[in-house]
From Swiss-Prot:
Tagged with keyword tRNA-binding: yes
Reaction catalysed by this enzyme: tRNA(n+1) + phosphate = tRNA(n) + a ribonucleoside 5'-diphosphate
Pfam families tied to this protein: RNase_PH, RNase_PH_C
Alphabetical list of NCBIfam families matching this protein: RNasePH
The family this protein is said to belong to: Belongs to the RNase PH family.
Name of the protein in question: Ribonuclease PH
Disulfide bonds: none
Length: 259
């Protein structure tokens, strides 16, 4: 089987590195690396929920995505300087939020909000899929933080793990985890978000340079789900380590009557 320019086989992911506790202030902070793509994912806990969510007893999870000006080869202006977010930035922010809300019981949070921030430090393709995969680990740490603080009505609000990967057809071959060099010339480009229980959260697929058959779609999904299994294993290995910071002390249990 022929190898790709970076030496990988078609079904192989780039090296994946997940570093927890990358910064100190958020409840969850993760640097995730998919090869040369590097994304800082944080999960911050704030009291209260958006106005439209108040008095429901339900929590909320929101997400924001951004790229540093020097994340790509040529510097780009910050979107805050331009005065508006691009359609791409808004789309990816919503995708990350939707993906993570699929795995958490918001009722268990009470009226608290988890804010996910994904900042691309270096981009070489697959930034949104790396962001989702890393943000899940940051979210899991934020849940651990909330549990220690005694703010969860359910100690296990996460129903599954979430990971995402890109897959596409390049040079007539189905390949997974496309770097920029492949993504920029792919005939078919797809992003797949999945759970570790075998279900799908979202599929974004486009025939960039050609139409594609249903049989090709099935092969793309099979390769993507196989790659997600590898990502789930990397997430589990990362989360098997102790919480990388100082956990809060929850409120003491109520005293029994008469004591």
């Amino acid at each position: 089987m022929s190898k790709r320019e970076d030496g990988r086989l078609d079904h192989e992911l780039r090296p994946v590195i997940i570093t927890r506790g990358f910064t100190e202030n958020p409840a969850g902070s993760v640097l995730i690396e998919f090869g040369h793509t590097k994304v800082l994912c944080t999960a911050s806990v704030t009291e209260g929920v958006p106005r439209w969510r108040k008095a429901t007893g339900l929590g909320w999870l929101t997400a924001e995505y951004a790229m540093l000006p020097s994340a790509t080869h040529s510097r780009s202006d910050r979107e805050s300087v331009r005065g508006r977010l691009s359609g791409r930035t808004q789309e990816i922010s919503r995708l990350i939020g939707r993906s993570l809300r699929a795995c958490i019981d918001l009722a268990a949070l009470g009226e608290n909000t988890i804010a996910i921030d994904c900042d691309v430090l270096q981009a070489d393709g697959g930034t949104r899929t790396a962001a989702i995969t890393g943000a899940y680990v940051a979210l899991a740490d934020a849940v651990t933080y909330l549990s220690a603080a005694g703010k969860l009505s359910d100690p296990r609000p996460l129903s599954c793990a979430i990971a995402a990967v890109s897959v596409g057809v390049v040079d007539g071959r189905i390949r997974v985890d496309l770097p920029y060099e492949e993504d920029s010339r792919a005939e078919v480009d797809m992003n797949v978000v999945a759970t570790d229980t075998g279900t799908l959260v979202e599929i974004q697929g486009t025939g960039e340079g050609a139409t594609f058959a249903r049989s090709t779609l099935d092969k793309l999904l099979d390769m993507a789900l196989g790659a997600c299994d590898t990502l789930f294993a990397a997430q589990r290995d990362a989360l098997a380590l102790p919480y990388p910071g100082v956990l809060p002390q929850g409120p003491p249990p109520p005293k029994a009557f008469g004591t």
